[in-house]
Swiss-Prot record:
Binding site for substrate: 109
Protein name: tRNA pseudouridine synthase A
InterPro entries: PsdUridine_synth_cat_dom_sf (IPR020103), PsdUridine_synth_TruA (IPR001406), PsdUridine_synth_TruA_a/b_dom (IPR020097), PsdUridine_synth_TruA_C (IPR020095), TruA/RsuA/RluB/E/F_N (IPR020094)
Entry EC number(s): 5.4.99.12
Cited function: Formation of pseudouridine at positions 38, 39 and 40 in the anticodon stem and loop of transfer RNAs.
Family: Belongs to the tRNA pseudouridine synthase TruA family.
GO biological process, alphabetically ordered: tRNA pseudouridine synthesis
Gene Ontology MF: a single term: pseudouridine synthase activity
Oligomer status and interactors: Homodimer.
Enzyme class label: isomerase
Record's keyword annotation contains Secreted: no
Catalytic reaction list: uridine(38/39/40) in tRNA = pseudouridine(38/39/40) in tRNA
Name of the coding gene: truA
Domain of life (superkingdom): Bacteria
Length: 264
């Protein structure tokens, strides 16, 4: 039996999604909880391996098990064995041809910036603080050049192992909600650190250090050293993963926090 789960987590205290020796990971916690409920070893496959400190409201995983359990066991039962900062949001039995990573057609991230002179306290681990005033409208205009198929070498981490830097950005929007600025971006896939590198350069434009045209110039240069520093992990969320309709996976609010699905 193959089962898919929707997973939400606060990544602040984890060394990323992927299981590693001697450090805490989201994958290890989830597999341990699932193994207890299934009463057999469970290994999971995810839609996107988030980095250390990155969060998710829309991570999708699948696993194969011989255990027969009610849906409540895979949701509430698993949640009872998980730490408070990881939770199962939904469960669905899927066809054998489903794969959390390889069946996905697009992924969507939201990056939240707290744009205020003073740092936040309540949301300190869920946003990235920028004390400089930011012009969200300039950031929005600058980001539009990213739409479509492009070579994202300028926004690709040096250690990225992807075979190609080409990605197809389907949606990008920058909006302000009071003191919060949200960068919302959806693509067929992302190269390593792509969203955080894009946000780092948009911040330079937003605070007036660079012109609106700088983003397009960086894209054309295909040179990571010419772009801004990588933005912090704190404000980044994997909010949704798209799959072909015939898999009929549950749809839940993307968030995070106060954000509606149609915002951003």
């Amino acid at each position: 039996m193959k089962i898919a789960l929707g997973i939400e987590y606060n990544g602040s205290r984890y060394f990323g999604w992927q299981r590693q020796q001697e450090v805490a990971s989201v994958q290890a916690c989830l597999e341990a909880a699932l193994s207890k409920v299934a009463n057999e070893p469970i290994g999971v496959f995810c839609a996107g391996r988030t980095d250390a400190g990155v969060h998710a409201t829309g991570q999708v995983v699948h696993f194969v098990t011989s255990a027969v359990r009610k849906d409540a066991a895979w949701t509430m039962g698993v949640n009872s064995h998980l730490p408070a900062d990881i939770a199962v949001r939904w469960v669905k039995t899927v066809d054998n041809d489903f794969h959390a990573r390889f069946s996905a057609t697009a992924r969507r991230y939201r990056y939240i910036i707290f744009s205020h002179r003073y740092r936040p306290a309540i949301l300190a681990q869920g946003v990235t603080h920028c004390y400089m005033p930011l012009d969200a409208e300039k950031m929005e205009r600058a980001a539009q050049c990213l739409l479509g198929e492009n070579d994202f070498t300028s926004f690709r981490a040096v250690q990225c192992q992807s075979r190609t830097p080409w990605r197809n950005v389907k949606h990008v929007k920058v909006t302000r909600h009071g003191a919060y600025i949200v960068v919302d971006i959806k693509a067929n896939a992302f190269v390593h650190h792509m969203v955080r590198n894009i946000v780092g350069s948009l911040i330079e434009i937003g605070c007036g250090n660079q012109d609106v045209t700088w983003m397009a110039e960086l894209l054309a240069l295909k040179d990571r050293t010419r772009a801004a520093a990588t933005a912090k992990a704190d404000g980044l969320y994997l909010v949704s993963v798209d799959y072909p309709d015939h898999f009929a996976l549950p749809k839940v609010p993307m968030g995070p926090l106060f954000l509606a699905d149609d915002e951003g």
